[in-house]
A protein has these predicted regions:
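Phosphate/NTP-binding elements of NTP-utilizing enzymes
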Residues: 1-135
Length: 135
């Protein structure tokens, strides 16, 4: 049995990269997407979501980046927006169903601690809400 966060990180990675397992029967995106990963606090977002997706809680640990659900060779390291240990925005290589690179998906990390305004005004393809965010 795998954990909820690990399982969700795998699915987020598939949507970001377009690299779906053959057995997957859920929704498939046929284009690069915008995905938000939203935690309760910045700290929990980094320690859970960032760690599961990128493989490390520390954005400064370049050797560990790419050891999580998102494959290292899909991460655009030149356009990885960081703030200390936090990854804020990442560009992830997306591939079509034939395996051809067709653009870059965007992943953004956010927290509800920043206020509900950070969740307004954007058209987003996929949102991972970690834990129960509503009372």
């Amino acid at each position: 049995m795998i954990g909820k966060s690990f399982g969700e990180a795998a699915e987020v990675s598939w949507h970001l990269t377009g690299k779906y397992p053959s057995w997957y029967t859920g929704h498939r995106f046929d284009k690069p997407i915008l995905a938000w990963c939203v935690g309760i606090t910045g700290d929990s977002t980094r320690k859970v979501l960032q760690k599961e997706l990128f493989g490390t809680e520390s954005a400064k640990d370049n050797k560990a980046l790419g050891t999580g659900a998102i494959p290292r060779d899909c991460i655009d390291f030149d356009n990885l927006e960081k703030d200390g240990n936090i990854i804020k925005i990442g560009k992830i290589k997306h591939y079509d169903s034939f395996g051809n690179h067709d653009g870059f998906s965007t992943i953004e990390f956010r927290s509800t601690q920043q206020g509900e305004h950070v969740l307004m005004g954007a058209t987003v393809d996929y949102i991972w809400l970690d834990r129960l965010l509503c009372p």
